[in-house]
């Protein structure tokens, strides 16, 4: 998934201006993640940068986001699915500056301090800088849908980046920022914020199967992820997973979920996309599913040689040699270039 990109440098005690060039270079390395906007904020002890791919509020949702009093600065890569509910709850406590779904993070922090992450329903990696207090908070979503890496240099600077390449040459030590964790500068350590009973199989192994509950939960999950101010489509392989999620998306695509189905969507029909070798069985299956659910279907072919030629770029972007991930990502890179 390509979304926005964030980079940040914290623990700056010898003048942020000296590190501005580094911060810009870190952000430039991940600019492919955000073609719509590049932004940077330089504070007393931190620099935050953002590369934006617009999904919600394209006109005014540029980042870094800044609170009305100018004391809180935020960079986010992600989507907050329950932002409308949170806005309604917080509107008396915070003056929202944009329509961005991510601005609710600033409002929550202002009201609750760091004890708000459980309030978020979404996928995210964010860095929040409280300039007045001189502290910062970094967090990642429960299962790590959104990528984030953390690194340190020999001068004690802490850095984060959506991709490893943003830290290369600057950090002497770096590692993945753990899913479901946050880092608060006052604590100086990673802390798990997301924990559930079902993480221990012993707690759920005897639970009865409830097919209707599974159906309702899956449909609700797909529906809330259709929140968008720009056109969207579905990737359809013809397999069970993509067929089910595409069918659910098609069910709700005609109306804007942001209005609880009261307003028509801005695009008349859901488009589906499938890519593969010519005459591949998956393409045939995807075509059948598209016909059955009624999407405008696009079938793209690529050759084995084109796949081999793309390998270097694929590995550069996904930053892993894992065979399964490389195999799945190769046709996806060809698809997004069309």
Spans of features found by a protein language model:
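Acceptor-substrate binding/catalytic loop of class I
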Residues: 324
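Adenylate-forming
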Residues: 327-333
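Conserved small/polar residues in nucleotide/adenosyl-binding loops
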Residues: 336-338
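Cysteine-centered catalytic environments shared across enzyme families
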Residues: 2-321
């Amino acid at each position: 998934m390509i979304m926005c990109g964030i980079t940040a440098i914290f623990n700056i005690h010898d003048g942020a201006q000296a590190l501005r060039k580094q911060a810009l270079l870190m952000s430039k390395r991940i600019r492919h993640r955000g073609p719509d906007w590049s932004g940077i904020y330089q504070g007393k002890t931190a620099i935050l940068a953002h590369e934006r791919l617009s999904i919600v509020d394209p006109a005014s949702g540029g980042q870094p986001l800044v609170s009305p009093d100018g004391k809180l600065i935020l960079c986010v890569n992600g989507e907050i699915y329950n932002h409308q509910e949170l806005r309604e709850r917080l509107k008396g406590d915070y003056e929202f500056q944009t329509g961005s779904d991510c601005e609710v993070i600033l409002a929550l922090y202002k009201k609750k301090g760091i004890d708000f992450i459980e309030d978020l329903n979404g996928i995210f990696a964010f860095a929040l800088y409280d300039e007045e207090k001189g502290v910062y908070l970094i967090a990642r979503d429960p299962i790590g849908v959104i990528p984030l890496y953390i690194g340190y240099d020999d001068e004690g600077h802490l850095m984060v980046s959506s991709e490893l390449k943003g830290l290369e040459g600057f950090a002497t030590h770096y590692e993945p920022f753990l899913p479901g964790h946050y880092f608060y500068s006052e604590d100086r350590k990673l802390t798990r914020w997301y924990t559930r009973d079902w993480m221990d199989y012993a707690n759920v192994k005897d639970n009865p199967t409830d097919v209707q509950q599974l159906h309702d939960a899956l449909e609700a999950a797909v529906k809330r992820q259709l929140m968008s101010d720009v056109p969207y489509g579905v990737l359809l392989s013809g397999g069970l997973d993509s067929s089910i999620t595409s069918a659910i998306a098609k069910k709700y695509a005609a109306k804007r979920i942001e209005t609880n189905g009261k307003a028509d969507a801005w695009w008349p029909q859901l488009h589906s996309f499938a890519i593969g070798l010519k005459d591949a069985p998956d393409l045939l299956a995807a075509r059948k599913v598209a016909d059955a659910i009624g999407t405008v279907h696009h079938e793209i072919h690529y050759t084995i040689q084109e796949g081999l030629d793309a390998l270097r770029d694929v590995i550069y972007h996904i930053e892993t040699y894992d065979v399964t991930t490389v195999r799945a990502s190769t046709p996806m890179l060809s698809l997004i270039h069309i």
